[in-house]
Amino acid sequence: MTSTIYIHQPEKAVSFTRLPNFLFEAPTFSPLSNEAKVLYAFILRRTELSRKNGWADEYGRIFLYYPICEVVALLHCGRQKAVNTLREQQYAGLVEIQKQGCGKPNRIYPKSYEAVPNTDFKKSRSGTPED
């Protein structure tokens, strides 16, 4: 059986998403599911696009849209799992989700992680992020 040895080939560049170490190293985030950690990495990537495109609210806070159907496709999961994964992030203090109503997708505001309280956010039941 032969294997291919890969060498740097610029014409076949691969895209990467950064996964922050603090999600695995900080005790506060140890209860967070791996799906929530991966989704947060993709949210951070979209945050950079939102910043470049000038997507900020009236207070200057960067926001993004991540419809539930896109979370389902990204994580290869069902709708309820996608909603619960966003809810986990909200309870962990990683994002703020603002409902817009009238069939519009929710705004997601990524938050700073330095001052997140230590809480068991998987058991919390308040709020429901939906698209």
Regions found by a protein language model. Name each.
Residues N34, R46-P110:
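Winged helix-turn-helix DNA-binding recognition segment
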Residues M1-C69:
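Short recognition helix of helix-turn-helix/winged-helix DNA-binding domains
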Residues K37-A41, C69, N106, K123, ...:
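Active-site-proximal helix/loop capping residues that flank conserved catalytic or ligand/cofactor
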Residues F24, I43, T85-R87, T128-P129:
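A periodicity- and composition-biased signal for non-globular, repetitive helical segments
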Residues F22, Q100, Y113-A115:
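Generic structural motif
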Residues T2-S3, S112-D131:
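Charged low-complexity intrinsically disordered patches
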